[in-house]
Amino acid sequence: MTVDDSLSPAGVATPHSSGIRVVVVGLGIAGLTTAIECHRKGHTVIALEKSPVIRVLGDSLGLGSNATNVLEKWADGKILQQLKSLADDISIFEALDSAGKLYAKDDAKGFGADNGMIINRGSLATTLHEYAKMLEIDIRFGAAVTGHWEDESAAGVIINGEQRLVADCVIGCDGIHSKTREAVLTKEPTAVPSGQAVFRASFDSTSVCNDPNARWILAEKGVRDRLSQYMAEGGLALSLATGKRGQNITWQLWHEDNHNANELWSEHNSAKLENALGMIRHWPIYSKVVPILRHTPKEALTDFKLVNRAALPTWISHAGRIIIIGDAAHPVLPIVGQGGGQGIEDAATVAICLQLAGKTHISLALQAVERLRYARTSIIQSSGPKIYAGVRNPDWKAIEKDPSLIMLPRPKWIFGYDVPRDVYEQFPLVKRAIEEGSSYTPKNIPPGGRYEFLHDFKE
């Protein structure tokens, strides 16, 4: 009996062999990964992006080992190695008070160079785009989706109010302010401001090298990177890090939202460095860190509003041929470090479910995606406010006794997850549950289905 090697976690199908035509809307990290994963599983992809070029806004993001486990299967590992060459080499996380006293030090397991990565968003998006082009995926820029449609046999979009595209399904990866979500939900979900915002910036370290008062941060340049988090009461915290072994400086200042922050990376106009510095001017460590922060280029700084969103009632349209994934379905607060990773997990899941269900069962495939992903992403999404609450007013005496109280949780069920293997193993069970109308409990969630502060992931 011949075994189809494409029906395996690392398997690659013959291009266009499934007969399934997919429209991917939005080419952020989730959208680019979806386009690539769908191509690898034999689907014909049309990928649409309203911007004229790949957007490179934003600073760094973390991809845990659960995300890089997907990327490592591309081109025999070459793409992941290319990304790692562009990534930061953060091997130490430090937690300090506003005077600079060190209370906790942690390795970067889950995000370290051996498995995950911390990488500039622009570098990641550009590399994924180049790989998608190499695969000859149909990518169309300047293609704003102005409408959606579906019936029992097909689905599609209207581009720029004129062109009508026909496909078997539409996958909306168009982010927090998703247009595709309008085709799924009868009303836009309520976004609840968290009361917090974060100044964010990333820039080249060259000018810092020449500043005797600032270059202390580059003491390990060429060797490794380090992330130091200075924390005070009231949720005020400064994260200061080097990147690419000292080639870059990245910093974030978490603070109370003064209503000047914006939830769009493209909005830099209201972000003023002096406003950020004024918030920490009373810190004992101020005179040490301010020389570094003053090198921030005006165009590199943004003040990003943090918004809480509850899990959506569904990700799938009424006729079952349009689905939203990634930030369009389950945006995650940045403190969790899983926004990009969960989008990548979604991408792998939807590509495999379409492959296993086949062209005549598109609706079943998308239902399977939701059943496999919904509980996991909802639990991870809910962890953001909990993690933030844990560091908002640090109890330094308790932390001195138990440093894990202040460190980012690294649960094994998140970081040790192998999404391709799980989807191939679980799809028959999910399919049966859908066909029988019975319940299905995914295997990718923690016992009890609740988020807990765990540090049980081991590399």
UniProtKB/Swiss-Prot annotation:
EC number: 1.1.1.-
Keyword Flavoprotein: yes
Binding site for FAD: 49, 62, 121, 327, 340
UniProt entry tagged with the keyword Flavoprotein: yes
Gene3D superfamilies registered for this protein in UniProt: FAD/NAD(P)-binding domain
Named cofactor requirement(s): FAD
Enzyme superclass (EC): oxidoreductase
Pathway annotation from the record: Secondary metabolite biosynthesis
Function: FAD-dependent monooxygenase; part of the gene cluster that mediates the biosynthesis of the benzazepine alkaloid nanangelenin A which contains an unprecedented 3,4-dihydro-1-benzazepine-2,5-dione-N-prenyl-N-acetoxy-anthranilamide scaffold. The first step of nanangelenin biosynthesis is catalyzed by the indoleamine 2,3-dioxygenase nanC which produces N-formyl-kynurenine through the catabolism of tryptophan. The two-module NRPS nanA then utilizes anthranilate (Ant) and L-kynurenine (L-Kyn) to assemble the dipeptide product nanangelenin B.
This protein's name: FAD-dependent monooxygenase nanF
Organism: Aspergillus nanangensis
